[in-house]
Amino acid sequence: MNTILLGNLIKIRWIAIFGQILAIFFVFYFINIQIPFFESLVIIFLSVAVNFYSYLEQRKNKTISDLKAFYFLLFDILQLGFLLFLTGGIINPFSILILAPVITSASYLPAFMTVILSAISIAIITILNFYYIPLNLGEEFYLPQIYNFGLLASLIITVIFIAIYAYL
């Protein structure tokens, strides 16, 4: 059993949900970047639903098993992956946040669970480098392929570094 409290994970997810909603509204309404607004909100509100369910679970148990914590963090990685797919892939400045569940896992969960979450994060990061809905910035905007490769490599290296460093 790990030492992480379910309530802490729920609070962190509420902060993420609030930040995601704020970012989507700001980008769509104030910066006027055309993103899949409704679809993005659907993905975010899935997190709201899961967090309400987690809150009900927390009323029964304050602590969470390693396996449930693993699934909790896996959901966060997948949810952010889908949101990044809708909003520009890894060139989205918020793509770095995909590291947060890996950091949490490395801090609290057994190594094999962190390795699995790291591998899934790396797979999602790699997929998002090639497949995503581009941001419609109004004019032609392309980053050089070498930049995309560098960003991909830096995110992958960071995931690996976090996973290894936590267990040294």
Which residue ranges define each predicted feature?
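Generic transmembrane alpha-helix motif of multi-pass integral membrane proteins
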Residues: L78-I90, I96-I116
